[in-house]
């Protein structure tokens, strides 16, 4: 495709290909002059909820099919599958030698990646960090697993209206694939090079419900705490917030707390 050489793409799971695509778009949009930057001070924090599940499926299938005749594994099996390989591939692409790792926290993965990037930059550990996440889990294991959890909508005849997280008739989500990426940069560093600045991160918060494997706390304790933590970190008051971007998976049990 337009972002990855076909030969190189064969060494990558689809989730990594998405990561490379969005990272290239973000770096280009940021205007970072990679050749004239201190590459030791540019990092990559890029997450995936599960990583190369398609690759795992393919290799497990090949093993089951050929095990009687002496199974053979693709030498790229592990490098394609692991969830931190996308961050590694992005750093290799640009020669970034700063902090490099993956986050993995289910649906909060990319948000955690951005939060970590913010914290490392304000600690002086990096001037800029390429941050985001990607996923490519539309595979038998991905679809079958979520279906077994009753997490997917059964409105197969009207997929365009099936995802309805704030409706009493919600019955699950629709799976998708793709990636998203931002370039976070220390403010003065960005100003000095005349960067196009979309927004400023004022603060971040993190928390846990400590309640259930998949269901959110019925009183929204984790959600309340994380917003309080973020406001405190940003030194802001609730009335200063104009917009709350809530996370709605459209499952029946998980999101009654969003209206509390």
Go through each PLM region and give its residues:
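Conserved active-site "lid/cap" helical segment
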Residues: 1-42, 226, 230-238
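Active-site nucleophile and cofactor-binding loops and adjacent substrate-binding regions
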Residues: 11-16, 39, 76-84, 101-109
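Active-site-proximal alpha-helical scaffold in enzymes
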Residues: 19-33, 86, 91-94, 99-135, ...
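Condensing-enzyme catalytic core mediating Claisen C-C bond formation in acyl metabolism
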Residues: 157-236, 240-243
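Conserved small/polar residues in nucleotide/adenosyl-binding loops
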Residues: 256-260
């Amino acid at each position: 495709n337009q972002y990855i050489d076909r030969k190189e793409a064969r060494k990558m799971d689809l989730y990594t290909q998405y990561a490379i695509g969005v990272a290239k778009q973000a770096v280009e949009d940021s205007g970072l002059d990679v050749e004239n930057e201190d590459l030791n001070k540019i990092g990559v924090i890029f997450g995936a909820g599960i990583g190369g599940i398609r690759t795992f499926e393919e290799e497990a299938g090949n093993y089951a099919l050929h095990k009687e005749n002496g199974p053979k594994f693709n030498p790229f099996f592990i490098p394609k599958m692991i969830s931190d390989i996308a961050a590694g591939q992005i750093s290799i692409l640009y020669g970034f030698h700063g902090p490099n790792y993956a986050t993995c926290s289910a649906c909060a993965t990319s948000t955690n990646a951005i939060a970590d990037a913010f914290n490392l930059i304000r600690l002086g550990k990096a001037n800029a960090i390429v941050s985001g996440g990607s996923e490519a889990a539309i595979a038998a294991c991905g679809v079958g697993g979520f279906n077994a959890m009753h997490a997917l909508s059964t409105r197969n005849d009207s997929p365009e209206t099936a995802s309805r997280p704030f409706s009493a008739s919600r019955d699950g989500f629709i799976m998708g694939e793709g990636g998203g990426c931002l370039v976070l940069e220390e403010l003065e560093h960005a100003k000095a090079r005349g960067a196009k600045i979309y927004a400023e991160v004022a603060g971040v918060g993190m928390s846990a419900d400590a309640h259930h494997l998949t269901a959110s706390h019925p009183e929204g304790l984790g959600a309340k705490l994380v917003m309080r933590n973020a406001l405190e970190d940003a030194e802001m008051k609730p009335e200063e917030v104009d917009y709350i971007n809530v996370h709605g998976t459209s499952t029946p049990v998980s999101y009654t707390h969003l209206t509390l």
